[in-house]
Amino acid sequence: MSHVRLHDFRSYSRQELELAEGLVLIVGPNGAGKTNLLEGVHLGAQGFSFRTRRDVGVVRFGAEASRVELRGRARGETPFATRITVERGGAKKIVLDGASVRSHEELRRRLAVLVFTPDRLAVVKGSPAIRRRYLDRMIGRLVPSSASLSTEYGAALGQRNAALRRMRAGLVDREAVAPWTAAVARLGVELERARNEVVAAIAPGFTQEAAKLGLPSADLGYVSSEVSVEALDERLATDVERGTTSVGPHLQDVELSADGRELRIYGSQGQQRVAMLALLLAEARALSEATAEAPMLLLDDVLSELDDDRRTSLLGGVPAGCQVLVTSTTDRAVPAGAPRPAQVIDVAAGSARER
């Protein structure tokens, strides 16, 4: 990413910046707009905010619309330009290389961006559903041909559950459920295969990066469901009674552990943070190897909770070629032994400038 322009975005009225390759340190006091700047870059690169599901929230107070424009080179060679406009009424327009696109998925296929914010700790300590969603997003980045599997499976599952409830009400017989049973089984097997493939690609790097960050014997695992037409048919009576499908990948969990103990339950806040950072670094490495393109990393408020050794390990663990935007309240956050920032950007009162 070489150029970013924000127009009526959050705290920024007009802002234009040239971004350096490598490590970019964004410095400023709390509330100055550092996270807003990262959010603007993410919106421009991925088509949506990492902070809110309601895009209208990015529109600056009193403005009618917000606009983000980015320029850069994908895979180090191919120029790209994006323009995202969000209107206060809720309409959003995405333009990639001068042409309107219908979905932000087209941006995600073109540009890889990984994010850490304090809220991301929910992936480690939150519900299984959060971990499943995170894993399925990794599938979209690492195995693009399988990106829609989770959505397709969810749609088939919803149809089967609706048919189960109609059967419970006596409106249909089991023949109405059968086609959706077959679809859930077929898509479930494909989704489980994709999940296992991604976990196998990420797990070794996760263990290595966690150890470097001071969390030895960390492990990433996934236990597949035994989803099949036969398994679903065996549970049909129970499923009809409950009105929901009782076996499948929608009920599985991603296991993050250290020394055989679940970090969700037994991990300290610091260990959970390290695990999330190790997961991000492992995915960045896997993406670099699988796609020959180093992703962009957006790291918000991560350095303040790490000691110097862990800061050095984190920044040193970023794969070669990654552009990293990291926020901090002080320019002393990067230790002497860590890679040096290629650029320092000072943020104050909704404006940003290169030092």
What residue spans do the PLM features occupy?
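Short polybasic amphipathic segments
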Residues: V4, S66-G72, G90-D97, V254-D259, ...
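Conserved lysine of the Walker
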Residues: K34
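An accessory alpha-helical subdomain
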Residues: R120-L213
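Walker B catalytic acidic pair
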Residues: D300-V302
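Conserved NTPase motor "head" modules and their coupling/switch loops across ABC/AAA+ ATPases, GTPases
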Residues: M1-P29, L43, L171-M296, E305-D309, ...
